[in-house]
Amino acid sequence: MGLFGKTQEKPPKELVNEWSLKIRKEMRVVDRQIRDIQREEEKVKRSVKDAAKKGQKEVCVVLAKEMIRSRKAVSKLYASKAHMNSVLMGMKNQLAVLRVAGSLQKSTEVMKAMQSLVKIPEIQATMRELSKEMMKAGIIEEMLEDTFESMDDQEEMEEAAEMEIDRILFEITAGALGKAPSKVTDALPEPEPAGAMAASEEGEEEEDEEDLEAMQSRLATLRS
């Protein structure tokens, strides 16, 4: 506490160092999320291969869409890391300016990076807090809340899912189809007939559905 009960402001250098530490901490969180999503994606890929061998087209489509969503999530997380690196560079510049001018200066580069970072759900809370502190310190201006969220184009998703399944099917058959299938509607390999398989088919389908739902749930949790 300062005089008359007022909170004493932290020195600019201390503020910059604190912001840099918080950003590096969030970068480690993002790295961990990327690894978790990619690890789960490998499991999904194996499940797609298994479903294709059983001739389960619908399961292939659902899982392929999950892979696409996961890859989009990873791309956004990598983009957020790039923005955080921009902010870190901006903090280094602020320290250099501070040594010469004796005060922090407004930065359009930091402003642009923070505008992008506050829109990312995984790190939104921390970035909003940092933005308020930076606004108070005069580094960035007040940012308007951008409520517009771009929606995934359904047709683009369908086409991407078809392309992903085509690629995976071609990989599974080791080129036995002669070429990569052009559409998901192309015939999938038929399951080999077996007497014992017919009796347990219903139970296996229920297990497959449960596994599919569990996998979707895990991926959704990792992306959120």
Curated annotation (Swiss-Prot):
One of its GO terms (cellular component) is multivesicular body membrane. The lineage of its organism: Eukaryota, Metazoa, Chordata, Craniata, Vertebrata. Residues 201-213 have a biased composition (Acidic residues). A lipid is attached at residue 2 (N-myristoyl glycine). Expressed in lung, testis, heart, spleen, skeletal muscle, kidney, liver and brain. It comes from the Eukaryota. Belongs to the SNF7 family. The modification Phosphoserine is found at residue 200. The keyword Membrane applies. Gene3D superfamilies: 6.10.140.1230. One of its GO terms (molecular function) is phosphatidylinositol-4,5-bisphosphate binding. This is Charged multivesicular body protein 3. Residues 22-54, 149-224 form a coiled coil.
